[in-house]
């Protein structure tokens, strides 16, 4: 729509967000999409959560490189890798990258390294194929965010209230 001047009301500087898991990036369709995005300089954010796992195989078994390394082969693709378990860093990176995409009208890959805290799918129990559960728990973003809030002088009472309200909102949705 942008290239053909078919932008409608309220769509100025729109950004398309493709949220992907790391294993999906080994599929040909992702490569084709990135190739077209850089060729046409489309305003697309490829937000890749890299937990190092396919459904039941780890990254070492399924790919030669991470998406940031792979995407470097696409001339014109912006790329950034972050610790996705750090909420504040993630938020700041997203703000910066979305600003770049909106102003420069080009694609960008945000590679966020995150822990896999639960089962990958309901049919495959994590205990059956993983030996990294304790390490993954150490990278849980929620305790890190809570600690950052406390360091920013947000009281435990306030945090508990927000948690309770969020849980209630989630359960009632």
Which positions does each model-derived feature cover?
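Glycine-rich ThDP/TPP pyrophosphate-binding loop and its adjacent helix/strand module
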Residues: 1-172
């Amino acid at each position: 729509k942008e290239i053909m001047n078919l932008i409608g009301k309220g769509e100025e500087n729109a950004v398309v967000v493709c949220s992907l898991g790391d294993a999906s990036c080994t599929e040909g369709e992702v490569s084709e999409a990135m190739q077209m995005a850089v060729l046409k300089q489309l305003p697309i954010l490829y937000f890749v959560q890299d937990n190092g796992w396919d459904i039941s195989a780890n990254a070492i078994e399924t790919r030669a490189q991470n998406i940031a390394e792979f995407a470097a082969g696409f001339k014109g693709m912006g790329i950034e890798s972050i610790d996705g378990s750090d909420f504040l860093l993630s938020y700041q990176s997203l703000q910066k990258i979305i600003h770049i995409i909106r102003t420069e009208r080009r694609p960008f890959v945000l590679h966020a390294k995150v822990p896999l805290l639960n089962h990958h799918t309901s049919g495959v129990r994590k205990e059956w194929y993983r030996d990294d559960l304790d390490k993954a728990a150490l990278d849980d973003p929620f305790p890190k965010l809570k600690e950052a809030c406390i360091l920013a002088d947000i009281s435990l009472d306030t945090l508990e209230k927000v948690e309770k309200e969020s849980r209630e909102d989630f359960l009632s949705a």
